[in-house]
């Protein structure tokens, strides 16, 4: 039996913030000879994405409970029980040595199923505030890790696994020193875009004129509207794209990023070594604010809560950052990153499997 490869089941779903870090760890361990399967849901992004990475995926039926009506909440215990039973059957067949919970609804019943079978449960929390599922699973987990300090009182801070092409970018000093011309502003609202960025940045561009050049990811279906907004502001020269497929190339081009502060975005910007102006999504637990705070504290970023994200405030901030200031901020961002996060998570998975 000692010659058999170790088996890992990754539990992650719903959003890229959960799925992409899980894929990074999965590939790292597969390169070491591990056999990996995935536990997800059939109606979320992992259903299409994970098989494209050469990983087999099993599905359970589960969805979130937040914002659901009374009827759905009353049915929740039965739904969770059924999902637990499905996950347990899948694990009894695959027999993983360890499971890795990266977040999403699937982690709850999946983690419980593993625990009930005596399989070690390793958790990774990507956000600065722990999600409901991970808070609950932390009580039964073998190992708990966090990307940012503060999500759990005693968990190791290991960072977020990020894409290798971002990690491979030249360091800020190499990349940014000697740059001249307009400040290059990369605007990223996530794949769905961010209306506040789409509405505000064209007006900011009008105030800043030829001191900046902007590359703006508008999000799905918004490209034409945003292009018209720039043209209407007398700034048609700026580049607007619906999606940016090669984010590493975009980071390499940029001097500064204006964006939301999802966990993966913050970690990628730190790893790339870029200054940022963060506009956290307004959520009741302020998750994105807490994600961005370590970089603001490090002097690598500025946070604008959405009500403060005005044309004048943004234009004033961007115009106040010289190239020297931006280089200093970029170096601070890189210094605050944890570039070996993938290895750290993978090492904890290996340790739990051997225990």
Swiss-Prot record:
Leading EC class: transferase
Gene Ontology CC entries for this record: plasma membrane
Pathway participation: Cell wall biogenesis; peptidoglycan biosynthesis
Keyword tags: Cell cycle, Cell division, Cell inner membrane, Cell membrane, Cell shape, Cell wall biogenesis/degradation, Glycosyltransferase, Membrane, Peptidoglycan synthesis, Transferase
Residues that, per the record, bind UDP-N-acetyl-alpha-D-glucosamine: 15-17, 127, 163, 191, 244, 263-268, 288
InterPro entries per the UniProt record, alphabetical: GlcNAc_MurG, Glyco_trans_28_C, GlycoTrans_28_N
Family in the record: Belongs to the glycosyltransferase 28 family. MurG subfamily.
Protein name, per record: UDP-N-acetylglucosamine--N-acetylmuramyl-(pentapeptide) pyrophosphoryl-undecaprenol N-acetylglucosamine transferase
């Amino acid at each position: 039996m000692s010659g058999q490869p170790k088996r890992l089941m990754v539990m992650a779903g719903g959003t890229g913030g959960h799925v992409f870090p899980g894929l990074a760890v999965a590939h790292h361990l597969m390169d070491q000879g591990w056999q990996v399967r995935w536990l997800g849901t059939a109606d979320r992004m992992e259903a299409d994405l994970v098989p494209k990475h050469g990983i087999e995926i099993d599905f359970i039926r589960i969805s979130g409970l937040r914002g659901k009506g009374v009827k759905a909440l009353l049915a929740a215990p039965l739904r969770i029980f059924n999902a637990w039973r499905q996950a347990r059957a899948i694990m009894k067949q695959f027999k993983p040595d360890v499971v890795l919970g990266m977040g999403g609804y699937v982690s709850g019943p999946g983690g419980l199923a593993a625990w009930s079978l005596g399989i070690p449960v390793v958790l990774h929390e990507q956000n600065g505030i722990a999600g409901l599922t991970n808070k609950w699973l932390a009580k039964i987990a073998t190992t708990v890790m966090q990307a940012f300090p503060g999500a759990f009182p005693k968990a190791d801070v290991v960072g977020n696994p990020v894409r290798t092409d971002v990690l491979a970018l030249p360091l800020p000093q190499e990349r940014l020193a000697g740059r001249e011309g307009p400040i290059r502003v990369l605007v990223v609202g996530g794949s769905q875009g961010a209306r506040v960025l789409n509405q505000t940045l064209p007006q900011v561009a009008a105030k800043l004129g030829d001191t900046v050049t902007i590359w703006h990811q508008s999000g799905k279906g918004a490209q034409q509207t945003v292009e018209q907004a720039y043209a209407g502001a007398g700034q048609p020269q700026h580049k607007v794209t619906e999606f940016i497929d090669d984010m590493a190339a975009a980071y390499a081009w940029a001097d500064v990023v204006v964006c939301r502060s999802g966990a993966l975005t913050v970690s990628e910007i730190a790893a790339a070594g870029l200054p940022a102006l963060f506009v956290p999504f307004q959520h009741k637990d302020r998750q994105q604010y807490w994600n961005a705070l370590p970089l603001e504290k490090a002097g690598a970023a500025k946070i604008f809560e959405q009500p403060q994200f005005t044309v004048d405030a943004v234009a004033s901030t961007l115009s106040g950052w010289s190239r020297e200031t931006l280089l200093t901020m970029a170096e601070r961002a890189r210094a605050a990153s944890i570039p070996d996060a993938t290895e750290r998570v993978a090492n904890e998975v290996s340790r739990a499997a051997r225990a």
